[in-house]
């Protein structure tokens, strides 16, 4: 029996996961287009100035999926599926290193500071602590996307893949809500 090379495994994984990766690529390209066409402040203000009670209630919990939750799940997987757990945890660690490096490189101010300096109102949610620096890239969003992507690559169920895609989008949106 011939062992597949890493490149062959990657190509196979990309083919098998096209139902997750294609929508992700489309959303990423749409987001890139919006960022290229519109000012960052206008985008944030458009999103932020349309609060709703459900969003105010749910997004503080959804955003937590981009914190320690992925590492806890990775640790639990470690108890039962060593290879899968190591994959999930390694994706998280690599992502965290990349985000930490980029945050320190860009040192972007967070919307709270920018809006305050411009005299603009910023809708906030009670109980959610707002920081001042290192806004870009979003660690929560990266953690969630990396986590849900790694899970989508592991599972075979297409409905679960779609669920993971939707959850990663919700966490990302919760960061600008």
Regions found by a protein language model. Name each.
Residues 3-10, 123-177:
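Membrane-embedded catalytic cores of phosphoryl/pyrophosphoryl-handling enzymes
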Residues 31-35, 93-101, 166-177:
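Aromatic-anchored segments of alpha-helical transmembrane domains
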Residues 19-20, 74-101:
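Interfacial segments of alpha-helical transmembrane regions
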Residues 54-55, 81-85, 156-162:
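Membrane-helix interface segments
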Residues 31-36, 63-81, 140-145, 151-154, 173-176:
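Hydrophobic alpha-helical transmembrane segments
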């Amino acid at each position: 029996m011939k062992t597949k090379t890493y490149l062959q495994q990657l190509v196979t994984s990309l083919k098998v996961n096209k139902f997750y990766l294609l929508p992700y690529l489309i959303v990423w390209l749409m987001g890139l287009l919006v960022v290229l066409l519109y000012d960052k402040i206008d985008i944030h203000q458009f999103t932020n100035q349309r609060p709703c009670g459900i969003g105010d209630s749910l997004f503080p919990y959804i955003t937590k999926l981009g914190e320690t939750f992925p590492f806890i799940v990775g640790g639990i997987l470690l108890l039962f599926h060593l290879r899968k757990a190591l994959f999930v945890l390694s994706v998280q660690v690599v992502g965290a290193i990349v985000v930490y490096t980029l945050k320190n490189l860009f040192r972007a101010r967070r919307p709270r500071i920018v809006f305050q300096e411009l005299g603009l109102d910023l809708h906030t949610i009670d109980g959610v602590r707002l920081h001042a620096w290192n806004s870009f890239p979003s660690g929560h969003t990266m953690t969630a996307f990396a986590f849900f992507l790694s899970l989508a690559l592991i599972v075979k169920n297409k409905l679960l893949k779609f669920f993971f895609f939707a959850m990663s989008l919700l966490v990302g949106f919760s960061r600008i809500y």
